[in-house]
Amino acid sequence: MRDADDRRAALWQGRMAERAAILALRLKRYAILERGYRIHGGEIDIIARRGDTIAFVEVKARPTMDGALQSITPQKRRRICRAARVWLASHPYAAAMTLRGDAVFVAPWRWPHHVAAAVELDFG
């Protein structure tokens, strides 16, 4: 029972972090194209566009901002790239745009911290 409660709490925390990240991105004039984009073997929390840039955004909720960037593991980066490749294949207009892997870090009682180009995209 405790494990189920912990999973529910983590899921709720993740949803709230994504909502905060979306608000922060919208205030920076990003248009949200997708939220919770998932494929087999990959996922992207938010896909956003501003001007000629498409940002594949990973959202991380942490108790503090310390070490938040390190929480994006090489395995997570591969999953983001895999999902981005599939998304790009179904959105050919995006091929001519600048593609970037961003992150938004969310901590309690702090404004979300958006880091552009925090995730190295490797489409090779």
From Swiss-Prot:
Residues making up the signal peptide according to the UniProt record: none
HAMAP family: UPF0102 (MF_00048)
Superkingdom, taxonomy of origin: Bacteria
Recorded family membership: Belongs to the UPF0102 family.
Organism for this UniProt entry: Methylocella silvestris (strain DSM 15510 / CIP 108128 / LMG 27833 / NCIMB 13906 / BL2)
InterPro entries the record matches: Restrct_endonuc-II-like, tRNA_endonuc-like_dom_sf, UPF0102_YraN-like
Protein name: UPF0102 protein Msil_0293
Gene Ontology molecular-function annotations: nucleic acid binding
Pfam families, per database record: UPF0102
